[in-house]
Amino acid sequence: AILRIRTRTKPITVAQRHKRRRTILDKLTRHPKMQLARMDDVAGCRLIFNSVAELYEFRGSFQKARFNHRRRHDLDKYDYIKQPKETGYRGIHDVYEYDVRSAAGRALAGLYVEIQYRTLVQHAWATAVEVIGFITESQPKFQRGDNRYEDAMALASEILARSEEGLNGPFP
C-alpha cells in the first residue's frame, strides 16, 4: 500500500514480481543450504523509472518513510547501478522483512519482500537477457550455455549505461 500511495502521482511503473517455480528450484539447487522460507526474492515488486536520478531520488525518500518494515541489509549492498554485475545487470534490490500489526495480515509477518528499482533502459536490457533464455539453449542470466550471449549482453549493458545514462556499466 505504501508503494501505491508514493508512486500514484509519479511517472513510475510499478509491477508485481513473482519468481518462477523453475527459478526457485534452480536457486535452491545452486545454494543447498538455502531454505525456501528464508529466500528473500520470491515475492516483491519492481519499480521502473525514466532516469537514474529519479530512481535514486524516490529510493532516498522511500528509505526515510515511516513504516514498520525493516530493510535487511546495508543501503548499498545490492546497488548494482554503482557496482554492476559482471553480466551487465544493473538495478537496485532492497529486501524488507514484512511487519504488519493487523489480525488479517499477521500470517504474513516476517515474510521477506524484495523491491527492485530499475530504469527503463535497465529493464529493457534485463528483459532481453530473459528472452535469450527463452529462445536459446543458453541462460546468460545464470552464466550458463554459450558465453557469447553473456559477452554480448555485458557489452550491450556498457553501451546503454554510457550512451543513455551517462554511467559506466560492468567494464572499468
Model-identified regions with their sequence ranges:
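Short, flexible, solvent-exposed loop/turn segments with mixed acidic/basic and small polar residues
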Residues: 29-40
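Helix N-cap motif at beta-to-alpha junctions
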Residues: 50-54
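Residue(s) in the substrate-gating loop at a strand-loop-helix junction
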Residues: 47
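A short, structural micro-pattern
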Residues: 39-41, 86-90, 107-111
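Surface-exposed, low-hydrophobicity interaction/linker segments
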Residues: 1-30
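Short Gly/Thr-rich strand-loop-strand
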Residues: 62, 67-105
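Hydrophobic side chains in well-ordered alpha-helices
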Residues: 55-61
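An acidic, glycine-/histidine-flanked metal-binding catalytic module
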Residues: 1, 106-172
